[in-house]
């Protein structure tokens, strides 16, 4: 009992004590909280009332961090872009956010141009509709943003950044950064992303439409900072997207494709010359005697087709009394690669479908003759179109060279030049006639994302551009940092400029032929990153990796260049252009340097050899013309043939003479070209131009000491490489 009483007394005392203590603790905590709140309110009032410094006003801009997994999951597709513009349409008509919406593809042009879509939204009980089109621009370049060509209210280029951008200030900073390159390229036409391009479609700021472009842009940027909810209209899925207005311009890629696209012209040739194609004598007269057998074969194919069609009409209960002209038209429609429509056939729809299948089946059984006929007509049309379009091709090449020279003058390397990234600026009222005269239009830049200013900054450095490029227009140097390129080459600025030189050369070939020059060599880029990584893992020096990659690339490029030049020699020699003055100045400097370097090489070669030892014979070699050197070589070869055991000195002399002739002939040709450039008006063929450009690239970007591996047991003769390069320039 006493223990129980003692416990109760202890418990009672503890409860009373704790109650008193808790009262004081709660009071202290409440007082402290009140003081903290009061101090916070005073701090906020003081902060809002004091003047804001410039440093405080400045918005902190941070580059958003993303992971490859995020990019893969959130990749933006054409469907996402279509949905985006469907929502823009909803905002424009004022429909509810939950209004029913539909999209439908109307046509897909097989030539690769935009797909047209119909956008439909139910508003006030009625379906509102409009159209838009979308298509990809260019080849994916790995490290570069993806672009689409969209027509919606205006012609737009929509650029999706590689890494999602979530912060508006970083997005705006990126736009301004591109503007710095554009300012330096002025007055060349360039288009850059602008927020006003798309925002003004859903909200027009009062008085902004009559402002200069830059002022209007600043007004929209300020408005978006204050009205942050509108920033979402610059986003697709999780990222801000760049929008460029292309309404005033034309794509160079579309123009080049149209110059060489003979598909429609072939169909027109077939449909307009029915009597010629189905009459062997007339076929021979139009397409040449060598094609006579093809004319006979296609006439036989038509006879088989006509019999099958007439039997089909009888079996279908249709009068067999169908004119020969109608059946010829149906046959020629399929020969042109098209199908007969219900209106043209004047038959029930189900029969038209069967008719098309029947004609297609008949042609497939004689596909060899059909293909030969199509190829003959295509070749004929291409030849006619080529002659008609040569002035436009020459004009494009002239303006490509003018752009290249301008980039060099402004010390800018675009590093991803290609037809899809170049605009054509001319008077729309005169299109396409202005293409006949290069002075009536100019080429400009669509996207400057990969560009770099190679004029050294105050600290003597050149900014590091994005690595990577479009394989058909890029060199291995696109994949190495400035630091590595500076170590591998003597002149980083020159290498950056030559990246544009290479792309321009490829575009010149495409403008003249409609084809890519280095399709096989471009495949090296699929493995180039792996070679770089494996080289690093093996502990190779960066310069050794550059040499290894360059060796494989340039050997392939040299062989492919020679092959393509031989294939297209007649076409390329027939296109003449007048070199712009800016380009002549650039070319003359290159030629002078090359002549000097080759002359030094000749002297070094003669001094280092042992076959001709006396000072007199060496001087004679130095003074001799290529023809004299060649004559001497023939004498030595005849002497070797007459000897049972010729000495090694004789065989060495023959190798030396071959090499000397190559070098001297190269100097002679370069001097002739230099003399031509000194004239007030310098005309040159596309063939000579391409040879000169490739020669400079090969010697500048593929160093002589890289021609063979240092560990190779057998060193190739320098003459073999120089001879091959020379053949490409003859």
Residue positions per predicted region:
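Activation segment signature within eukaryotic-like protein kinase domains
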Residues: 396-397
């Amino acid at each position: 009992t006493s223990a129980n009483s003692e416990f109760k007394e202890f418990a009672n005392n503890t409860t009373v004590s704790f109650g008193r203590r808790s009262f004081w603790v709660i009071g202290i905590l409440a007082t402290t909280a009140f003081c903290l709140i009061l101090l916070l309110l005073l701090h906020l009032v003081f902060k809002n009332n004091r003047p804001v410094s410039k440093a405080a006003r400045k918005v902190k801009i941070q580059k958003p961090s993303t992971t490859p997994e995020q990019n893969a999951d959130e990749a933006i597709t054409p469907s996402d872009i279509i949905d985006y513009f469907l929502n823009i349409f909803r905002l424009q008509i004022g429909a509810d956010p939950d209004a029913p919406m539909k999209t439908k593809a109307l046509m897909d042009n097989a030539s690769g141009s935009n797909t047209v879509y119909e956008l439909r939204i139910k508003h006030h009980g009625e379906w509102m509709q409009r159209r838009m089109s979308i298509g990809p621009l260019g080849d994916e370049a790995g490290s570069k943003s993806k672009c689409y060509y969209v027509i919606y209210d205006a012609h737009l280029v929509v650029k999706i950044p590689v890494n999602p951008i979530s912060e508006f200030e970083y997005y705006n900073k990126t736009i301004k950064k591109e503007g710095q390159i554009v300012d330096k390229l002025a007055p060349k036409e360039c288009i850059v992303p602008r927020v006003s391009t798309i925002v003004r479609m859903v909200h027009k700021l009062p008085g902004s439409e009559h402002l200069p472009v830059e002022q209007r842009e600043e007004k929209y940027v300020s408005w978006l900072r204050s009205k942050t909810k509108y920033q979402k209209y610059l986003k697709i899925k999780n990222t801000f997207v760049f929008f460029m207005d292309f309404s005033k311009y034309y794509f160079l890629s579309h123009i080049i494709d149209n110059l060489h696209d003979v598909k429609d012209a072939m169909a027109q040739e077939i449909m307009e010359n029915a009597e010629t194609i189905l009459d062997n004598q007339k076929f021979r007269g139009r397409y040449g005697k060598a094609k006579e057998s093809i004319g006979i074969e296609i006439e036989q194919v038509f006879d088989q087709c006509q019999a099958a069609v007439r039997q089909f009409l009888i079996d279908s209960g249709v009068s067999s009394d169908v004119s020969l002209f109608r059946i010829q038209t149906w046959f020629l429609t399929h020969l042109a690669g098209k199908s007969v429509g219900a209106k043209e056939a004047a038959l029930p729809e189900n029969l038209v479908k069967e008719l098309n299948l029947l004609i297609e089946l008949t042609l497939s059984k004689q596909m060899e003759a059909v293909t030969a006929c199509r190829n003959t007509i295509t070749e004929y049309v291409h030849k006619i179109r080529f002659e008609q379009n040569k002035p436009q091709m020459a004009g494009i090449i002239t303006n490509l060279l003018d752009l290249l020279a301008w980039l060099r003058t402004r010390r800018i390397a675009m590093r991803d030049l290609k037809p899809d990234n170049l605009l054509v600026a001319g008077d729309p009222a005169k299109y396409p006639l202005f293409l006949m005269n290069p002075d009536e239009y100019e080429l400009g830049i669509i996207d400057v994302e990969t560009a770099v200013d190679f004029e050294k900054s105050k600290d003597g450095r050149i900014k590091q551009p994005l690595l990577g490029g479009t394989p058909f227009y890029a060199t291995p140097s696109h994949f190495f940092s400035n630091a590595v390129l500076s170590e591998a080459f003597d002149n980083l600025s020159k290498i950056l400029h030559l990246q544009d030189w290479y792309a321009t050369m490829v575009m010149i070939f495409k403008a003249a032929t409609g084809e890519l020059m280095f399709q096989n060599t471009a495949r090296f880029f699929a493995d180039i990153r792996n070679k770089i990584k494996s080289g690093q893992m093996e502990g190779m020096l960066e310069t050794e990796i550059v040499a290894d990659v360059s060796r494989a690339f340039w050997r392939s490029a040299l062989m492919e260049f020679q092959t393509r030049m031989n294939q297209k020699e007649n076409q390329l020699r027939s296109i003449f252009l007048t070199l712009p003055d800016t380009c002549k100045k650039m070319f003359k400097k290159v030629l002078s340097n090359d002549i000097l370097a080759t002359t030094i090489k000749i002297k070094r070669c003669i001094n280092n050899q042992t076959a001709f030892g006396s000072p007199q014979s060496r001087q004679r070699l130095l003074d001799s013309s290529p023809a004299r050197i060649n004559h001497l070589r023939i004498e030595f070869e005849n002497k070797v043939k007459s000897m049972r055991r010729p000495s090694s000195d004789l065989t060495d002399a023959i190798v030396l003479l071959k090499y000397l002739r190559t070098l001297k002939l190269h100097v002679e040709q370069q001097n002739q070209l230099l003399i031509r450039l000194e004239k007030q008006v310098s005309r040159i063929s596309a063939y000579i131009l391409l040879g000169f450009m490739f020669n400079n690239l090969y010697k500048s970007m593929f160093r002589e000491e890289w021609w063979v591996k240092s560990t190779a047991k057998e060193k190739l003769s320098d003459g073999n490489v120089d001879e091959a390069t020379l053949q490409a320039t003859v």
